[in-house]
C-alpha cells in the first residue's frame, strides 16, 4: 500500500534531496519584521521560531521557497531570534508532492485493478510504486534543468 508520504520520501532519496537541519540566530533591530534565513528551501511545517526564548512559530509567515520569515509583530530591539528547522537542496515538500501526484495521475490514467476499480494510492500495486517514483524523478529533473537553463551567463 503506497501513501503520498512514502512515495515522496522515495523521490527525495532518488534525487538526493534529503533534509538537513539548521539553527540560525540573529538580533532584532526593532523595526524589521521580515528576515532572510540563509537556508532554502525550508520546511515550514517543522520550523521553530523563538524570540527571547518564547515560541512564536504560529505567528510567523514562512516563504518556504525563498527562506524569508515575516513576523506578525515586529520583535523588540535587541531581541534574540532563533530559527531551528530543516532545509532541502532543491524542492519544498509541496513541490515534491506535486511531482508524485502528477506522475501517479499520468502513470495510472485509464488503468483499473482486476475488479475494474480505478487505481488509487491505496490500491497501487507494490510493483508499480517504483515506476511512479522514477517518473516523478524525471519531472523533478526536468524542472531543475529548465531552471538551470535560465542561469547561464552568455555575456562574453
What are these regions (language model features)?
Residues 152-154:
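Short, surface-exposed beta-strand/strand-loop-strand elements in extracellular ectodomains
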Residues 1-129:
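Conserved short "hinge" loops at termini or chain/domain junctions
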Amino acid at each position: 500500500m503506497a501513501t503520498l508520504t512514502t512515495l515522496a520520501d522515495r523521490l527525495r532519496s532518488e534525487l538526493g534531496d534529503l533534509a538537513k537541519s539548521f539553527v540560525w540566530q540573529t538580533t532584532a533591530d526593532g523595526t524589521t519584521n521580515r528576515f532572510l534565513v540563509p537556508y532554502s528551501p525550508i520546511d515550514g511545517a517543522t520550523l521553530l521560531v523563538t524570540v527571547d526564548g518564547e515560541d512564536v512559530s504560529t505567528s510567523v509567515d514562512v516563504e518556504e521557497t525563498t527562506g524569508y520569515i515575516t513576523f506578525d509583530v515586529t520583535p523588540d530591539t535587541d531581541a534574540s531570534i532563533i530559527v531551528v528547522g530543516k532545509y532541502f537542496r532543491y524542492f519544498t515538500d509541496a513541490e515534491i508532492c506535486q511531482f508524485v501526484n502528477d506522475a501517479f495521475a499520468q502513470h495510472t490514467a485509464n488503468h483499473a485493478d482486476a475488479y475494474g476499480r480505478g487505481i488509487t494510492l491505496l490500491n497501487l500495486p507494490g510493483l508499480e510504486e517504483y515506476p511512479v517514483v522514477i517518473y516523478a524523478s524525471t519531472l523533478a529533473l526536468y524542472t531543475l534543468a529548465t531552471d538551470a537553463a535560465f542561469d547561464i551567463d552568455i555575456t562574453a
